[in-house]
Amino acid sequence: MTKKKIAINGFGRIGRLVFRAYLERAKEFNETYEIAYINDLADIDSNIHLLKYDSVHGALKQEISKIGDDKFSVGENEITVTSERNPIDLKWGDKGVDIILECTGVFASKEKAMAHIESGAKKVIVSAPCTNADFTVVQGVNHQELNNDHVVISNASCTTNCLSPVAYVVDKEFGIVNGYMTTIHSYTGDQSTVDTFHKDLRRARAAAHNIIPTSTGA
């Protein structure tokens, strides 16, 4: 069986954790999938360091080594690194890439994500809500409806992935007429660590010291 070749576009928080999850389940995935490329605007040394040392999950168990200016190895995996802003310039087709894991947060509509398809990839999985995606998948709710006709696929939001499985079961067993929900979210990279200016005065508060009401894109 020929392995499906995967590229990660955007090696921030989500991109790195997707890669770590892939490494943790290497025995399950190595026969069918290979993460071969990472595209990110940060330099390779910074990305290697951030992958190796994680404040939440700890140091990477696998050995990681830089190979030249544009490659690194993790265990038995060798990854080529690029730094392109425009997916068209990545020429995924020439690289033999089948699936893009779109983790930048920038290409969050089908129109934008299709740039990867125009570049030669076959599928795009967006790690966020995606406007007009062919399919938005939530594991445990509708994952069995995913099919090969879906080209741009959204993995939904963190809130949706938390709420939907619970609501699905409650609605199936008892029925939901209407409802109201709130989400309590850990602070993220766009929340300031100190008090500072923000057009939303609630968001101007230091993340670690305040409970900050805000909206959600879920």
Regions found by a protein language model. Name each.
Residues 211-218:
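Short, intrinsically disordered, charge-balanced linker/junction segments flanking boundaries
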Residues 2-204:
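N-terminal Rossmann-like NAD(P) cofactor-binding subdomain of oxidoreductases
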